[in-house]
Amino acid sequence: MGSVSNQQFAGGCAKAAEKAPEEAPPDAARAADEPQLLHGAGICKWFNVRMGFGFLSMTARAGVALDPPVDVFVHQSKLHMEGFRSLKEGEAVEFTFKKSAKGLESIRVTGPGGVFCIGSERRPKGKNMQKRRSKGDRCYNCGGLDHHAKECKLPPQPKKCHFCQSINHMVASCPLKAQQGPSSQGKPAYFREEEEEIHSPALLPEAQN
């Protein structure tokens, strides 16, 4: 009995020894799951400064020229540069990238030889409210430049000339406006709407008294 058990134990050890080399080391299995980084070079095809992303036109991969070029996605967070990160259209770049379910995505983007990217001279534009106020619009209720009458926090103010802010006359008889002539007639429609709201009895209940 003992000799049979020893033989079975020895046989089991031999089979285990045969199976052991088939199992891959943990590090090798992990490396196989990670995406392989590839090297490319080319130019910036286009880049949206406001959204912070664009596409590279890869003209060479691992030193081998590509014809036609291949598009590679780029996000501003991957750009090697200081300050505001962006790319200029046609700017020469070198980069590492990977293959993903969405396509080719850049991992790190630099200028030729690993230098900083040049970037675009463009900067994101301000909000529409800032652009609107930069044209010299003012509140027709209090005369403030930082808001419109619809946004004014003050109660309805006494009627006054909306051109020179004088309370001695209305805009129709303003001498300063008359001196400017027809140039003052090109007032946008929303200016007239706000004037009508300021003059309306709903906003000026004291006018009914």
From Swiss-Prot:
Reactivation of LIN28A expression enhances tissue repair in some adult tissues by reprogramming cellular bioenergetics. Improves hair regrowth by promoting anagen in hair follicle and accelerates regrowth of cartilage, bone and mesenchyme after ear and digit injuries. Changing residue 42 to S: Erroneous subcellular location. No positive effect on terminal myogenic differentiation. Gene3D superfamilies: Nucleic acid-binding proteins, Zinc finger, CCHC-type. Expressed in embryonic stem cells (ES cells), spermatagonia and testis. Expressed in numerous epithelial tissues including the epithelia of the small intestine, the intralobular duct epithelium of the mammary gland and the epithelia of Henle's loop in the kidney and in the collecting duct (at protein level). Also expressed in the myocardium and skeletal muscle (at protein level). One of its GO terms (biological process) is stem cell differentiation. Its main location: cytoplasm. Induction: Negatively regulated by the microRNA miR-125b in response to retinoic acid. This is Protein lin-28 homolog A. Residues 39-112 form the CSD domain. The modification N-acetylglycine is found at residue 2. It comes from the Eukaryota.
